[in-house]
């Protein structure tokens, strides 16, 4: 089990670091009193591997409880319980700027100057910083920079492509564009199988409709261009730290063209070693047209 204690200066990025750890599959607990860490660690270690990555956020907001941290760490060490400490730091100038931008007061100086609170906090955290296994200075970091750094230290070293969940979603414009779409493509310019009597009753999941749609010159050109676009976009989304991408492909009713093309894009993404899923939101809607609604 990997057991990470996250601490550091207020405003240095502990919240963002914790979100990154959650994205990496860590079970995160915020501001657990240090005296409870021993019991929590024992429970985690007895969990039959159900919890194998844990992160505890400990900061100065714990007040007097924070003073118990060193006693707890010594206890864990004596009992050969492996843990690591991550310390988030930043320059005084950057911390002051962040507090001013957020219009928050410093927890150690709620009615006074932010700088006074920072000075006090540095003094109180000096010993825990000296014990830290990893110190990350976020002074020059944007959120994505910190995310990349967290992945570097705490990721599972799986291919970055596998860390972006891609959903290819077919839909019908008559039923509305999916509200959670990241990318939306309109394929209503492609010849419609709906007007072919022998194909009308089938969907884009059926071979006859799929073959008809994919052999169209417009489809061939569109799919190639879309694949080129995704080969450019996906690595950049991963670099940015995006965790989920929803690609919505729509036709009129969401039954023929969008389904066939969504399936084709889904297959190409998986061949390209990406983690993709396929959903057809409206493929059965036209079957229920004319039915009375409750």
From Swiss-Prot:
Name of the protein this chain belongs to = Nucleotide-binding protein CLL_A3342
Where is the chain membrane-spanning?
Answer: none
Instruction: Tell me the residue numbers annotated for binding ATP.
Output: 8-15
- What does the record give as the function of this protein? Displays ATPase and GTPase activities.
Q: Keywords of this protein's UniProt record, alphabetized?
A: ATP-binding, GTP-binding, Nucleotide-binding
MF annotations from Gene Ontology: ATP binding; GTP binding
Q: Signal peptide span per the entry?
A: none
Q: Which SUPFAM superfamilies would you find in this protein's record?
A: P-loop containing nucleoside triphosphate hydrolases (SSF52540)
Q: Quick one: which residues bind GTP?
A: 59-62
The similarity annotation says: Belongs to the RapZ-like family.
Sections of the chain in a coiled coil = none
